Regions:
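C-terminal amphipathic/interface module of NAD(P)-dependent oxidoreductases
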Residues: 302-325
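Short alpha-helix boundary/capping motifs
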Residues: 56, 74, 294, 304-305
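C-terminal helical subdomain
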Residues: 9-11, 91, 190, 239-297, ...
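A short, mixed-charge helix-start or loop-turn motif at secondary-structure junctions
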Residues: 179, 183, 245-248, 299-304
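Pocket-edge positions in alpha/beta enzyme catalytic cores
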Residues: 59, 83, 251, 303-306
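Rossmann-fold NAD(P)H-dependent dehydrogenase/reductase core
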Residues: 2-240, 320-325
Length: 325
């Protein structure tokens, strides 16, 4: 796929649609889903919605006590299993256990992530946002690949964001070994990587009718902002001087229930059949960014996040990085 494939489907859903509305009429009994980050924010709402429709949902957890408390009131067939995206060995152990106990995987929702955190290293010295948001999920998909390839019509959804507009992949200095660390640029690189991952994976699932998509869920107040001081969120316009959501945020931000809707639309919509690898927002395929529009910063997808050659280059690079982990 390429930027020219970013053509909306004319979806009946929109920016304010909720997870429940998107899944209305679906019966997911007999389906199996993995949702990373499934015990807070968007992930929790994604788990809630899938389970309410009968899907068996497996939630990888880094902090079991927190996960148990968050999922306690969620009804349905939900299982927790230990995994830390910053620890590739734990990712492989989770996947090995899943492969040994399951014969299909219908939905892989790569929801977990970190944003604009202070400089840190994970894995084999990887910059943490690239390491957690991309490499951890890449390792998970690689370890689950035999099952993904055997499962008919599987869907993989990678949560990117409008943050991809901040930065392309920093091919010559992925981990800020040479340049000064920029937490927002690093976040942008990771979100571009999420989109390119879905692009490349979609080609690898084609033989069995599988699809992979990336999505921008929208602006939502979730634990993702935990690394940002209040002063920075005020400067960004997300909060007013009183520390409460600004008028801009009230008008443009979504609730977690609304934020989960695009993920679930990408996971289930028949309108996306044959359109693997596209980037979605507001429950439809996103249009290319209109650089002359006042909404260019917030809407649409940039060409660097839809480039096939970059997607394959990142896949090969990620395989090399993973081989040493």
């Amino acid at each position: 796929m390429a930027i020219s494939d970013q053509v909306p489907t004319g979806s009946d859903f929109h920016a304010k649609s909720t997870a429940a509305e998107v899944l209305s009429g679906f019966d997911l009994t007999g389906k199996t889903a993995i949702v990373t980050g499934g015990y807070s924010g968007l992930g929790l709402e994604t788990v809630r919605a899938l389970a309410s429709k009968g899907a068996a949902v497996i939630v990888p957890v880094r902090t079991p006590a927190k996960a148990e408390a968050a999922l306690a009131d969620v009804k349905g067939n939900i299982t927790m299993a230990a995994m830390d995206l910053a620890d590739i060995a734990s990712v492989r152990t989770f996947a090995d256990d899943f492969n040994a106990t399951h014969t299909q995987l219908d939905f892989l929702i790569n929801n977990a992530g970190i944003m604009a955190c202070q400089q840190a290293r994970v894995g084999e010295g990887w910059e943490s946002q690239f390491g957690v948001n991309h490499m951890g999920h890449f390792a998970l998909a690689q370890s689950l690949m035999p099952l993904l390839e055997r499962s008919q019509d599987t869907r993989v959804v990678a949560l990117s964001s409008t943050g991809h507009k901040i930065s392309d992949i920093r091919w010559d200095d992925l981990h800020y070994d040479a340049a000064d660390y920029d937490k927002w640029q690093a976040y942008g690189q990771a979100k571009t990587a999420n989109a390119l991952f879905a692009n490349a994976l979609s080609r690898r699932l084609r033989a069995t009718g599988g699809h992979a998509f990336s999505v921008h869920p929208g602006g939502i107040f979730t634990p993702l902002q935990r690394h940002l001081p209040k002063e920075e969120m005020i400067a960004l316009g997300w909060l007013g001087d009183d520390g409460e959501p600004s008028e801009l945020a009230k008008a443009g931000f979504k609730s977690p229930e609304q934020g989960a809707s695009t993920t679930l639309w990408a996971a289930t919509s028949g309108a996306l059949n044959g359109k693997a690898g596209v980037y979605c927002e507001d429950c439809d395929i996103a249009i290319p960014t209109d650089l002359d529009s006042p909404t260019a910063r917030f809407m649409g997808v940039n060409a660097h996040a839809c480039d096939d050659e970059s997607a394959e280059r990142l896949w090969e690079l990620s395989e090399k990085l993973l081989s040493s982990a």
